[in-house]
């Protein structure tokens, strides 16, 4: 998915959450094929209408020639006067009718009609897409000019941004009181405007927004300079003159003499807000998303892969396990969902996709949040054989009870789609979070990767300082609670924004009830699993004998 996001300029009337899901964007892309046919028909109808109007014009020209020749005789004759009035009433109605017979409204309705099964973007979708782009820029440290040129790392896209596109991104930031990005993108809009033969945006608009953003970023002299440029360009501008005086007064309050207000302009300062720079978790989260946090060789040397064969069925169909981290344990179950199963689950989920929600820590109710941008759907076991099969397989993978687990949740991430650092389990003070379920806290999480983005979209643990990049057909698993039942703070994790590509995941949250003997309580918080299903005794599976992977594959396909 490249930087074609500003195609979202079409304004519709739907709920503004199209940008939260690439699946909806794919549907929108499909409708582009219908537009040329609709426009061609509209052009044909308009050409016919214009031919009729031209004919009426020629008829009136002939009548006018006669009227000019006869002069006042026409209107002094009562019959002619009557006919003149009649023509003005009835003939003009015909002309007016043909002029108003423009079918543009019908064309727009047909393009945006819900009967196509596609919701068209709104102005809020455009804003959401722009904010998503800014999130990507920050997380992956992308250069503004490179992004505007359609370049992401070494990937050169098919589209570049105009000055207007950059202006709209900057304005979206401005509306969020994000003056850091406003400055960056207004400056880029200004640079691009200078290269445009046909300007796509008014320079006055850029100067006014940029001046105010520079002021908010502590660049008063630069704000004054740009506002004076605006005033010289348009002395009748409704705010320019007043803003010049306002900036002069502010500089005077800072002790700057009026004679020095336009001298010795310092370099422009444009720092990210202190609320971000001072947030150590945010800094760690972004570094982990860039996969820049090194793992010690000592820790790596302890990791290993093995075949999980601790259930009778698994003797014949062992599951490949890759340990990614100890304490808290996190593993990847390899190749545990097939492409066909992924496709089937996606088809079941697509009609049900809705803006993803989170549990309100006070009320326990589900609400949308800006820190979780994606769409999700819940699939019950009876909705498809594939759901029942996957649920049964999760039981073999984890050795945990599925009867009290939540339904299978499917998520699709949109432009800059992400989920900020959070816990899957409820903390002690969040006693109402899962009260309605009556199954206790979330003991563990299984996360299936159903696609593999080209860049971004990793799962990161901000306290454990580890990054797991998505690998299609694999499933990430970890325990959320200590064995004695308390929440493990080291399981705080996040979904990194998707930079390039599509991210589909499905997850299963497994609860405490029914797992009293499958995962017995430990005596202290330091008790933790060495491997999946570790009951505290027996050897590690590190040296377990391997089996033929083909045998496992054949057996699983019969399940």
Swiss-Prot record:
Its cofactor is Fe(2+); L-ascorbate. Keywords: Dioxygenase, Endoplasmic reticulum, Glycoprotein, Iron, Metal-binding, Oxidoreductase, Signal, Vitamin C. One of its GO terms (cellular component) is endoplasmic reticulum. SUPFAM superfamilies: TPR-like (SSF48452). It holds the Pfam family 2OG-FeII_Oxy_3. It catalyses: L-prolyl-[collagen] + 2-oxoglutarate + O2 = trans-4-hydroxy-L-prolyl-[collagen] + succinate + CO2. It is found in: Endoplasmic reticulum lumen. GO terms for molecular function: iron ion binding; L-ascorbic acid binding; peptidyl-proline 4-dioxygenase activity; procollagen-proline 4-dioxygenase activity. 2-oxoglutarate binds at residue 503. One of its GO terms (biological process) is macromolecule modification. Binds 1 Fe(2+) ion per subunit. Fe cation binds at residues 422, 424, 493. Its EC number is 1.14.11.2. Residues 404-512 form the Fe2OG dioxygenase domain. It comes from the Eukaryota. Heterotetramer of two alpha chains and two beta chains. Exists either as a phy-1(2)/pdi-2(2) tetramer or as a phy-1/phy-2/pdi-2(2) tetramer. Catalyzes the post-translational formation of 4-hydroxyproline in -Xaa-Pro-Gly- sequences in collagens and other proteins. This is Prolyl 4-hydroxylase subunit alpha-1. The lineage of its organism: Eukaryota, Metazoa, Ecdysozoa, Nematoda, Chromadorea.
